[in-house]
Amino acid sequence: MPAESTFDIVSDFDRQELINAVDQARREVATRYDLKDTKTEIVLSEKELTITTESEMHLTAVRDLIQTRALRRNLSIKIFKFGPIQEVSGGRVRQVALLQRGIPEDVAKKLAKLIRDHFPKVQPRIQGDVLRVGSKSRDELQAVIRLVKEHQDEFAIPLQFTNYR
């Protein structure tokens, strides 16, 4: 048995599920009566999602549609960080949503402090965009997972637990 057990806290999403959710939203926009003739464009790139349409009302409807499709595919809507609505040429509007992947350093520090405050014998270590938590006791690690799940609403990113060893 290893001397120390560890697990990683990560913030990630299944890209293929996001692609499927966006494709479903595109199909629904093309067939839905109120959105059919709005020339709505939904562009998914590696790090962002761009929605361009005719009015703010249509933009809000498309954004809600994408979020609903993402939720149905077990993706957290916290992966979308929507920017401001911008006016573009032709009276159209655009909104860019950054796709959040990885734990930002400030969130990792807050998580590490939360863990250290409740479990002094547990060692959280920030490793890039992953927070590795180690302890000699597996029971303490399971208690840390419960603690982080209870406080997950305080963080603006979705958290998953991987590599439990």
From Swiss-Prot:
CDD domains reported for this sequence: YajQ_like
Asked if Cell membrane is a keyword of the record, the answer is no
InterPro entries linked to this entry: DUF520 (IPR007551), UPF0234-like_C (IPR035571), UPF0234_N (IPR035570), YajQ-like_sf (IPR036183)
Key words of the record: Nucleotide-binding
One Gene Ontology CC term in the entry: cytosol
Q: Any idea which GO molecular function terms this record carries?
A: nucleotide binding
Among Pfam families, the record links this protein to: DUF520 (PF04461)
Name which cysteines form disulfide bonds: none
Per the record, the coiled-coil ranges are: none
PANTHER family noted in UniProt: UPF0234 PROTEIN YAJQ
Family membership noted in the UniProt record: Belongs to the YajQ family.
Its biological function? Nucleotide-binding protein.
Could you tell me what this protein is called?
Answer: Nucleotide-binding protein RoseRS_0530
Q: Which organism is it from?
A: Roseiflexus sp. (strain RS-1)
The beginning of the lineage is: Bacteria, Bacillati, Chloroflexota, Chloroflexia, Chloroflexales
